[in-house]
Amino acid sequence: MDKDKLLEGRRILIVDDEPDVLDTLEDLLPMCITTRAATFEEAKALLEDQYFDMAILDIMGVEGYELLKICNEKRVIGVMLTAYAVTPENIKKSYDDGAASFVPKEEMHNITTFLTDIYEAKEKGKSFWWRWFDRLADYCERKFGPDWQKEHGFKVR
């Protein structure tokens, strides 16, 4: 299936305190209706007042985990994004707290693939994380070692 078609018209809130990240994500998602927020307060107000299919949430600068709680309450798919907090603990926390994916900023250029995986998994009734581990297995093994999933108790499939 064409990635753009699956994402076309989706309303996505992009939250990050770095303007260049907001610009890049908007450029990568022209098929979506994007709204941007640079602060926790701005994102919280948008989530409370508007409808979104999905929110891409920076973990560090904008209190991403607090925003994820709001997303879960509003049934908005939450995707965690980070540059500095790429750790097994944050991946596990994102998974446990109900995020649909965890995207390292250095993999941001593949955002359409990650988002498409989420919608494909949703259509198939599978865990949102089923393809994530396949796509980022090499990246994570290089960064954390070959047994990182087992050591941190991941059970997705």
Label each region the model flagged.
Residues R10, I14-D17:
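Acidic di-acidic motifs
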Residues K5-L7, E73:
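Short, flexible coil/linker segments at domain boundaries that flank nucleotide/cofactor-interacting
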Residues E66, E73, A85-P104, H109-T113:
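Alpha4 helix (beta4-alpha4-beta5 surface) of REC/receiver domains from two-component response regulators
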Residues T24-L29, L46, I70, K93:
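Alpha-helical interaction/dimerization surfaces of two-component signaling modules
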